[in-house]
């Protein structure tokens, strides 16, 4: 694809997929198409946040008639700046994805970053950052999803409680995600939480310090229990 000022995000993503069609199996190609479709949704939803005032006005006018205006208006130089949002938030919070698609999200991001650089749409630094982020996501997104499932299973064993009757010292995580501070076999320690959460060994094997977990913990008879759990965000 020759680089021209008129190449849009949408056109670049289509050209990337066209190149992949020549070399990928049908099943793998479907994963690529699914990931690129999700990336488009992410770009259209969150990309405008990075626009300066004149560009944002232009986008707002176009958006009135076209919800995908961001990808139709702006060039591919905007793609890689959204990779962290896409892999770190969007794929976790907004997408019900299986292990295969979660792994593919990182792989496709790496391939796309290299392709954008080869075609003159991204600099070396942007490519390197996106490739690194993609490699980490391929490994960590499936792990984080498995950990979230294990914590959810653990929450099912916690009896219903009257939150109003709990001391503020005995309930944490209602307002903000908790960050894993350290991991020991069968134990997760969270920042600003006094004492460990005991978990199955499989869960502690998956977890990593620095990951954020949307989770509510309650302390009963000196032991932390999982009351509710949402997502695990690898960092």
Task: State where each predicted segment sits.
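Beta-strand/loop nucleic-acid-binding surfaces
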Residues: 192-209
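Flexible glycine-rich surface loops and low-complexity tracts that mediate binding to linear polymers
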Residues: 114, 205-231
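Non-catalytic DNA-binding core/recognition domains of DNA-processing enzymes
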Residues: 25-117
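Generic N-terminal leader/targeting and pre-domain segments
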Residues: 1-20
């Amino acid at each position: 694809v020759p680089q021209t000022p008129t190449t849009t995000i949408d056109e670049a993503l289509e050209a990337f997929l066209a190149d992949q069609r020549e070399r990928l199996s049908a099943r793998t190609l479907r994963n690529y198409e699914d990931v690129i479709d999700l990336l488009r949704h992410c770009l259209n939803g969150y990309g405008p946040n990075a626009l300066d005032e004149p560009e944002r006005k232009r986008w707002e006018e176009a958006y009135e008639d076209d919800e995908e205006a961001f990808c139709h208006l702006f060039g591919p130089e905007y793609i890689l700046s959204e990779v962290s949002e896409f892999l770190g938030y969007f794929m976790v919070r907004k997408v019900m994805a299986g292990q295969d698609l979660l792994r593919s999200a990182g792989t496709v991001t790496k391939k796309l970053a290299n392709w954008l650089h080869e075609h003159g749409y991204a600099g070396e630094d942007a490519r390197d950052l996106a490739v690194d982020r993609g490699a980490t996501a391929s490994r960590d997104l499936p792990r984080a999803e498995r950990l979230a499932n294990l914590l959810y299973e653990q929450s099912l064993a916690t009896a219903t409680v009257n939150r109003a009757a709990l001391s503020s010292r005995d309930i944490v995580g209602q307002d903000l995600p908790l960050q894993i501070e350290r991991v020991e076999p069968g134990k997760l320690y969270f920042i600003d939480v006094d004492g460990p959460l005991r978990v199955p060994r499989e869960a502690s094997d998956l977890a990593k310090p620095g990951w954020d977990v949307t989770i509510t913990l309650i302390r009963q008879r000196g032991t932390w229990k999982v009351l509710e759990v949402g997502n695990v965000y690898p960092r």
